[in-house]
């Protein structure tokens, strides 16, 4: 509180004013002394008030620094492993998050942990490097009070459980010796629906809609490497196996969330190429056209350099496939992939395979590979789906040699896949999920909100963990932070 003081008032007589009596020399000195003392006291009080405000301000900053807490989360994805280092604090009993550079840092290393299926011990190298990165951003005195977790996603979900556990045990060994607070159960493979929920939390936290009317929230459609997630609040009845309920503040949200495993960009492309290769075996010359790869591409040229485990064995396709980029044919081929198994649908709505999907409603953010594809083609954020079709047609129909020259700074691994990505995006969002091409309620994004918070599911996992450290979510006990 700022001290309240009344300024001292000192009356000084005008220099030429006639006095009714004679002022003695002693009295004159006393008056001068009084003035000096009064001015000194006034300046002293003003200085005290100024310093008090400075101390209060500095004290608040120091208090926040003293209360700063840290959390480390390692996202073990299909194409790479990324560490997130979070700094946060509490004010009035509520957590305060700051995802700016001062209190948040991340680093990604390739390849993903799933690529170590044949050599689990190899996973320790990248995890150790990520732990060292985290240590450089957290004060040493806070190590024992800072938790570290590892959450693996679709790439690991595709592996057999025994192989998953072998890789996880290697990572646990590294995390146990990290110096951070860790428990073995904090390194695990999360479900696809959980991943979708975390992404939804990140987006709605960034947009400021957490804690508001559920139907005013924003949905997420996310295209990863091994899986695709669809997550939103639906007014329809959702079967319990497809719904999750979370609480934020005083509001409960019942959310449709599903992860379409094997329908991520890399996994779907691999599946398509394998289907084409199998069909080539039944042709006279043993060769079939691949409509999703630009003409002139040689399949075994760059496969050894691919960071994605899904395309690392591309050289096996040489001789059976001929690149013949054609957007319309690629769109048809990818749509056929998405319809497989639909005849087994037991629900009213099955947009992809035999999986229940309610009609999409409200606004949506298209993230991950949806974003990268739209960004590559420099599409407008509104109505971008309608622009993607002509852009995809031009790109797919171009010669590979010309594309390399046109995009010299783009990694050939990604350049080779944009024809497929463009067609697959239209097949999934428009042909399967029913989003109109001119629908402006869906935008592509990698960040959201006034603070441009990254749309990364790991941030949502961190937020939910801090907000509800002791609650039970999806049948799994949340960890206790230890403070």
Swiss-Prot record:
The tissues in which it is expressed are: Expressed in the initiation zone of lateral root and in the lateral root tip, the adaxial junction of lateral shoots with the stems, and in the abscission zone of flower organs. Not expressed in the rosette leaves.
Instruction: List the catalytic residues.
Output: 195
Please list the residue ranges that the record places on the Cytoplasmic side of the membrane.
Answer: 1-29
Q: Which residues are glycosylated?
A: 250, 281, 305, 326
Q: List the disulfide bonds.
A: none
Sorted alphabetically, which Gene3D superfamilies does this protein's record hold?
3.30.420.40, Exopolyphosphatase. Domain 2 (3.30.420.150)
Q: What is its main location?
A: membrane
The record describes the protein's role as: Catalyzes the hydrolysis of phosphoanhydride bonds of nucleoside tri- and di-phosphates.
What's this protein's name? Answer: Probable apyrase 3
Q: Which organism is it from?
A: Arabidopsis thaliana
**Encoding gene (name):** APY3
């Amino acid at each position: 509180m700022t001290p309240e003081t009344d300024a001292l008032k000192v009356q000084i007589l005008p220099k030429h004013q006639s006095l009714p009596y004679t002022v003695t020399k002693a009295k004159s000195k006393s008056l001068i002394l009084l003035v000096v003392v009064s001015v000194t006291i006034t300046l002293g009080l003003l200085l005290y008030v100024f310093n008090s405000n400075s101390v209060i301000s500095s004290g608040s900053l120091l208090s926040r620094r003293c209360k700063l807490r840290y959390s480390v989360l390692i996202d073990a994805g299909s194409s790479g492993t990324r560490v997130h280092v979070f700094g946060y604090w509490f004010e009035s009993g509520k957590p305060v998050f700051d995802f700016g550079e001062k209190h948040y840092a991340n680093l990604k290393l390739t390849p993903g942990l799933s690529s170590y299926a044949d050599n689990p011990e190899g996973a320790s190298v990248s995890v150790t490097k990520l732990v060292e990165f985290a240590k450089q951003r957290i004060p040493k005195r806070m190590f024992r009070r800072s938790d570290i977790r590892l959450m693996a996603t679709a790439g690991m979900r595709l592996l057999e459980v025994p192989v998953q556990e072998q890789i996880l045990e290697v990572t646990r060994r590294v995390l146990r010796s990290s110096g951070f607070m860790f428990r073995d159960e904090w390194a695990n493979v999360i479900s696809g629906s959980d991943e979708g929920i975390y992404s939804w939390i990140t987006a709605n936290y960034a947009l400021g809609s957490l804690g508001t009317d559920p139907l005013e929230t924003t949905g997420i459609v996310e295209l990863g490497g091994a899986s695709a997630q669809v997550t939103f609040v639906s007014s329809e009845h959702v079967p319990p196996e497809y719904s999750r309920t979370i609480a934020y503040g005083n509001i409960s949200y019942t959310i449709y969330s599903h992860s379409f495993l094997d329908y991520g960009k890399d996994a779907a492309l691999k599946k398509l190429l394998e289907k084409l290769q199998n069909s080539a075996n039944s042709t006279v010359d043993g060769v079939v056209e691949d409509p999703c790869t630009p003409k002139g591409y040689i399949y075994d040229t760059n496969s050894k350099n691919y960071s994605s485990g899904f395309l690392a064995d591309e050289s096996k396709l040489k001789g059976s496939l001929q690149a013949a980029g054609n957007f319309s044919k690629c769109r048809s081929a990818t749509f056929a992939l998405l319809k497989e198994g639909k005849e087994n649908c037991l629900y009213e709505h099955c947009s992809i395979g035999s999986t229940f999907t309610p009609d999409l409603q409200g606004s949506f953010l298209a993230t991950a590979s949806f974003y990268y594809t739209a960004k590559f083609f420099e599409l407008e954020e509104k109505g971008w789906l309608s622009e993607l079709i002509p852009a995809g047609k031009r790109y797919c129909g171009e010669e590979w040699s010309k594309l390399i020259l046109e995009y010299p700074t783009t990694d050939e691994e990604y350049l080779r896949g944009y024809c497929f990505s463009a067609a697959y995006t239209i097949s999934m969002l428009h042909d399967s999920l029913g989003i109109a091409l001119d629908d402006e309620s869906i935008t592509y994004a990698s960040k959201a909100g006034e603070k441009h918070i990254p749309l990364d599911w790991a941030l949502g996992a961190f937020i939910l963990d801090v907000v509800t450290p002791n609650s039970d979510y999806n049948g799994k006990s949340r960890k206790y932070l230890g403070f």
